[in-house]
């Protein structure tokens, strides 16, 4: 098995498959505009049994100073681009809502 990671160099950006919903969540909770990308998973990669395609997104907060603060990264796999991106959007949206709830409790 090859060691393989999703890299920005391989990603194609998309706003399809529910990404606009993720954009709405990001703006609502003051995160930077999401850049969701996808790529084909190599056949000999360790994660090839997860799906033919991988989708990737990094959640960043928008600071008043203009700097972006890294929060977490998401990767999802699927048999099709639509399946991978849709799964990623669902996981990221769930996390954003969960994080907002947790931060609200700690205020």
Curated annotation (Swiss-Prot):
InterPro entries per UniProt: Corona_NS2 (IPR006841)
One Pfam family recorded for the sequence: Corona_NS12-7
Annotated family: Belongs to the coronaviruses 12.7 kDa protein family.
Protein name: Non-structural protein of 12.7 kDa
Naturally occurring in which organism (per UniProt): Murine coronavirus (strain JHM) (MHV-JHM)
